[in-house]
């Protein structure tokens, strides 16, 4: 029986269970699988249970369901999962559906019983740690959730913030260019309002700091993803990050690095929205431009305090899935290769590996179980092999994760990138020619390899030899990405081995 080489490699790459209080340095080498708890896996293991995204109702995903599908996640080489918020939500079915997503909390000291019990959440943490994997939990400090108009909120339903005194006065954000409005006014609308906590008040601040430390400790959490970071004043975040005692990565939904990067001065990392937009635009069609992506890689590298602690992604529950723009599988493979081999921490959204194509929320919140969890789909296999070479490079090169990705050059359809110290570098060649792209040989200069050196292309498991002039002859075909690594460094790795 033939077994995929990345399965053999990943099976052998078991690490010690992580200690608590995982540091930013610990997280640099992780690869994250992001999932909505309600939409990933059910306790009963069903792959047919109905989940109509348009209904916006609970579909039955649980923490126990996740535990039962960790083989599926780890089989792609992921070393961490990020789950949606765990706190108790507003109980009503609103005009916008249920709070299945977890961002309409009402009681921060109780868990969302739809997902399971406290013991179930602890069991998920333990199950991950037994595999040497990390648990990241989504948290919300900016707001609570209310079924009704912002002008008529019953504040007594919120725990522990049970009076209006804990909140900013009611006003909806009208102008996102006004940072005071962004921080002090409310998200939501008069159907579901999101009362905005006044985090400038010591009583609110101290409550959150105590709560987040307890949450991390009680459930052995290794990292936090923080929602709506730009809607809270910056001086709140250093104390929150410190109280958590683990790596914190914030959502700052803005593509301008001049706006987004400074938030890394107040917490460990942020989601890399500055890269998201040019990455999407470069690959969502065969006419996309590489110029903006090339320039933004360099801008983020120079302007953000530490680009190696950012989260790289192209899909999540807030933005349309990549396949909603194009069904070209070659373009999807290039985007996935970029995410995993760029600077920072790769983040793949559940369903991306099955080429899910949901558009705007709620269509992009499909149930993963309806795919049947196949492990032989093209993107599942590509993600597994890309994570495998990244994990291997990290194990062999202590400087890999801190070496900042260098785009070697760009043209209308191609961008090659280099990451890793001399002699151990990975060179990734990305193309947006698409599945109908022609076959040709790219003569690549500037990759840093030596004349006569043999390289393995670890997607197709072929080899090339560096020319006497130092150029690498890279066979390109079908618009597929290429990933090069020194052949001699692969000895004993099982990478590109079928035995």
Curated annotation (Swiss-Prot):
Ca(2+) 1 binds at residues 142, 183, 196, 231. Binds 2 calcium ions per subunit. Calcium is inhibitory at high concentrations. GO terms for biological process: carbohydrate catabolic process. InterPro entries: A-amylase-like (IPR013777), A_amylase_C_dom (IPR015340), Alpha_amylase (IPR006046), Glyco_hydro_13_cat_dom (IPR006047), Glyco_hydro_b (IPR013780), Glycoside_hydrolase_SF (IPR017853). Keywords: Calcium, Carbohydrate metabolism, Disulfide bond, Glycoprotein, Glycosidase, Hydrolase, Metal-binding, Signal. Substrate binds at residues 56, 104, 143, 225, 230-231, 255, 318, 365. It comes from the Eukaryota. Glycans are attached at residue 218. The keyword Calcium applies. It holds the Pfam family A_amylase_dom_C. Disulfide bonds join 51-59, 171-185, 261-304, 461-496. The record marks 318 as: Transition state stabilizer. Ca(2+) 2 binds at residues 227, 251. It is an enzyme of class 3 (hydrolase). It catalyses: Endohydrolysis of (1->4)-alpha-D-glucosidic linkages in polysaccharides containing three or more (1->4)-alpha-linked D-glucose units. Its cofactor is Ca(2+). Residues 1-21 form the signal peptide. Its EC number is 3.2.1.1. Belongs to the glycosyl hydrolase 13 family. This is Alpha-amylase B.
